[in-house]
Design a protein with these regions (language model features):
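NAD(P)H-binding glycine-rich loop region in Rossmannoid oxidoreductase-like domains
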Residues: 50-90, 118-122
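Rossmann-fold NAD(P)-dependent oxidoreductase module
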Residues: 16-20, 101, 141
Length: 145
């Protein structure tokens, strides 16, 4: 069985991927503790608990993952001042922590979900909101790695 990490597995896309893949693969997932009740209780599911990025780094390095599917995000259509840190932490910082680890771990497949709002009205580099701008920025980090 392949070992797959799915981030954002309690969201709409991530939960559907988890449901579709869980019977055929070993699935690792990172979950905020307040979302644990939403998770499928399959024998193939491994939940990665962590309190900070250093702890996550140590745990990821012990895994031999084949694929990472990155669905985790913090979505806010019309952000407020207090949303900025949450958007940056979830949509840019967390993804970069993953990418840095995966680069060292030599994981071959990284699938990232983004948004069509990166190119609002069909115009390239015309983000609809801060959320879509953060997703676009993360795409640049993916290109770096």
């Amino acid at each position: 069985m392949k070992k797959i990490l799915i981030t954002g597995s309690t969201g709409f896309i991530g939960s559907n991927l988890l449901e579709n893949l869980i019977d055929r693969h070993i699935i690792y997932t990172t979950v905020r503790s307040n979302n644990l009740k939403k998770i499928n209780k399959s024998k193939n599911l491994r939940i990665i608990h962590f309190k900070n990025h250093n702890e996550l780094n140590k745990k990821l390095k012990k895994l031999q993952l084949n694929t990472v599917i990155h669905c985790a995000t913090h979505y806010v259509k019309n952000h407020k001042f207090e949303d900025i840190k949450k958007i940056i932490k979830a949509n840019i910082e967390f993804g970069n922590i993953l990418l840095e680890n995966l680069n060292v771990m030599n994981v071959k497949k990284f699938i990232n979900f983004t948004t069509v709002w990166e190119n609002y009205d069909g115009t390239k580099n015309n983000s609809f909101n801060l959320y879509s701008a953060s997703k676009k920025a993360f795409g640049n980090f993916i290109n770096f790695y």
